[in-house]
């Protein structure tokens, strides 16, 4: 553990700040790179220490639970083949998620794994019969499907329900999973346990918002309102990168006397990985003080943090520390390392890791095909993309299809990407919007506007629900085609949809275009709509907004006060940018007038 703190202290990108900091009330969003502080959280350099975050005094005298919430939606080799997955391909996006499931280099892939609940059900290579019954009948509520299931005299034991729940969660079918928990609550099939309440809390937070989740906690019997319930709420605040509320829950867990766990610290690492990397070392020191050992997920978060900062040396030091502590790299960790080597241009190192992942027989390690396709596509290795896809082609799995379409797009083989898409259409009577979305992204990347428009029409005609990922691709398509009015109209439709929340990138495509034009009015409009949609003001969002004023040569009245109100403090770069739009700046002419 001490070695980990030293590795982080040696890194400029992850400076260890003053550790006399405190347990505070937190508040910040996703994935910025060079962030100055955006919240009333820890400020390392000069601002006064704010209320309590990391007093480094979490009482560890309480008994500890052995629940491992780091599991849950693990991506394993048990993804179902498409022939058994028609219902999955047909599933519309039932939740708004800020993660882009089709993105091959999603830095937060491990975050999703860490935030899911463990249901203590062994994974099966085939969907449960109850799961099939729930999703196979379109237009039928989950309650009706389960009523019919009971009428037919089929199994209604806890294991059957939990297996179906795991399948629903694994496929991110959170709306149906929530309906299932509501039906169980009404029909009292078995006695509720804390994990059942935690599962429902998680689904309510995902589908209806964290504020509804917090309201639900008040209805949970006090005897079941334990650590698992609160850390589930914490994970959902972290998933939305809401620093203020995440830190508030973290502090409340301390106040309630819950023992600090590695899972809880991992959640804070995920949060700070996205919003303020300088705080990561403080979390590690807290782990050290409480004698908690980092687990595999801790190391994966740190590997991803270093890799996404392009600190490959630091990433390799984390891996060496991990090995010295006796923690073995799993295949998912290796995939993460390979991706970061690839994005850093270290082709040979990336390919070496990929070969290690593949082992002696790719057929036996079939579950790695998705990652192999993804990274080989990024490396422009057409021969390897084709070799891996050939193994999957006859009976492809869902994630392999998404990865293959994107990989062929990366190597500029659009016809091959289209062929994979057509194969899926033939194999399934209905296709998930995600499959359309990844092909649409290929069209966007290749500026194939007419093909993209045709695909959107085809998707609409098929009756597919359009999710956040698809709206994002459509908006980008119109922006790059110069049809900004249509892009903004699409954003409005996405906002008005009650089923999804547009991705932040959907707003940013339009903001960047208006900034390029020096259009302050419309840049401000999109900035405000982004806040109204529930996204907190972020450092780089203000950076973009201020650039609109600079490009328009217009004064940015009150900008400093607005930033201060959002707890955003400029770094040197932003301060210089702000000075250019300062309405009261001195010029040679103003000096003469003075």
UniProtKB/Swiss-Prot annotation:
Source taxon at top rank: Eukaryota
GO BP annotation list: mitochondrial mRNA modification
Disulfide bridge partners, by residue number: none
Compositional bias per record (Low complexity), positions renumbered to this chain: 62-75
GO molecular function, one term: mRNA binding
Transit peptide: 1-67
Spans annotated as Disordered: 62-109
UniProt KW keywords: Mitochondrion, Repeat, Transit peptide
Segments crossing the lipid bilayer: none
Keyword Hydrolase listed: no
Pfam family, one: PPR
Classification via PROSITE patterns: PPR (PS51375)
Family to which this protein belongs: Belongs to the PPR family. P subfamily.
Name under which the protein is recorded: Pentatricopeptide repeat-containing protein At1g15480, mitochondrial
PPR repeats mapped onto the chain: 226-260, 261-294, 295-329, 330-364, 432-466, 467-502, 503-537
The keyword Iron-sulfur appears for this protein: no
Location(s) in or outside the cell: Mitochondrion
Cellular component, GO, one term: mitochondrion
């Amino acid at each position: 553990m001490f070695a980990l703190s030293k590795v982080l202290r040696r890194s400029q990108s992850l400076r260890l700040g003053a550790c006399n900091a405190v347990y505070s009330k937190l508040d910040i969003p996703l994935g910025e790179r060079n962030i100055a502080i955006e919240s009333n959280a820890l400020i390392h350099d000069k601002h006064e220490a704010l209320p309590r975050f990391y007093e480094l005094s979490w009482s560890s005298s309480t008994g500890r639970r052995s629940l491992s919430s780091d599991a849950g939606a693990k991506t394993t080799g048990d993804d179902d083949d498409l022939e058994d997955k028609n219902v999955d391909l047909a599933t519309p996006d039932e939740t708004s998620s800020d993660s882009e499931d089709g993105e091959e280099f999603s830095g937060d892939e491990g975050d999703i794994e860490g935030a899911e609940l463990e249901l203590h059900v062994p994974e099966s290579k085939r969907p449960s019969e109850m799961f099939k019954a729930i999703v196979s009948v379109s237009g039928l509520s989950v309650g009706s499907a389960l009523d019919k299931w009971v009428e037919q005299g089929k199994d209604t034991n806890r294991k059957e329900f939990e297996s179906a729940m795991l399948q629903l969660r694994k496929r991110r079918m959170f709306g149906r999973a929530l309906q299932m928990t509501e039906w169980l609550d009404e029909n009292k099939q078995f006695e509720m346990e804390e994990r059942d309440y935690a599962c429902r809390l998680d689904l309510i937070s995902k589908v209806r918002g964290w504020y509804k989740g917090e309201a639900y906690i008040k209805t949970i019997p006090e005897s079941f309102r334990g650590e698992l319930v609160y850390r589930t709420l914490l994970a959902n605040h972290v998933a939305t990168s809401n620093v203020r509320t995440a830190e508030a829950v973290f502090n409340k867990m301390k106040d309630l006397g819950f023992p600090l766990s590695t899972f809880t610290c991992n959640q804070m690492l995920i949060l700070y990985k996205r919003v303020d990397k300088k705080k990561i070392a403080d979390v590690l020191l807290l782990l050290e003080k409480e004698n908690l050992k980092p687990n595999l997920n801790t190391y994966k978060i740190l590997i991803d943090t270093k890799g996404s900062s392009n600190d490959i040396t630091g990433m390799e030091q984390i891996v060496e520390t991990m090995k010295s502590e006796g923690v073995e790299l799993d295949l998912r960790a290796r995939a993460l390392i390979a991706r970061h080597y690839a994005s850093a241009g270290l082709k040979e190192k990336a390919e070496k890791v990929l070969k290690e992942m593949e082992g002696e027989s790719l057929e036996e390690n079939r579950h790695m095909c998705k990652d192999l396709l993804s990274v080989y596509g990024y490396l422009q290795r057409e021969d390897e993309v084709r070799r891996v896809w050939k193994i999957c082609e006859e009976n492809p799995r869902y994630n392999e299809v998404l990865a293959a379409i994107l990989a062929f797009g990366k190597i500029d083989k659009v016809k091959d990407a289209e062929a994979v898409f057509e194969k899926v259409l033939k194999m399934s009577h209905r296709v998930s919007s995600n499959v359309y979305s990844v092909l649409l992204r290929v069209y966007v990347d290749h500026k194939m506007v007419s093909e993209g428009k045709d695909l959107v029409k085809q998707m609409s005609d098929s009756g597919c629900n359009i999710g956040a990922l698809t709206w994002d691709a459509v908006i980008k398509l119109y922006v790059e085609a110069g049809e900004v009015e249509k892009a903004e109209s699409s954003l409005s439709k996405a906002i008005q949809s009650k089923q999804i929340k547009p991705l932040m990138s959907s707003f940013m495509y339009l903001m960047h275009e208006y900034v390029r034009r020096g259009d302050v009015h419309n840049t401000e409009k999109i900035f405000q709509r982004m806040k109204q949609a529930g996204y907190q003001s972020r450092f780089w969002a203000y950076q973009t907004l201020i650039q609109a004023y600079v490009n328009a040569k217009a004064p940015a009245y009150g900008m400093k006060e607005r930033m201060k109100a959002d707890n955003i403090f400029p770094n040197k770069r932003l301060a210089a940018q702000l000075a250019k739009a300062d309405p009261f700046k001195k010029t040679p002419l103003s000096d003469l007038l003075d």
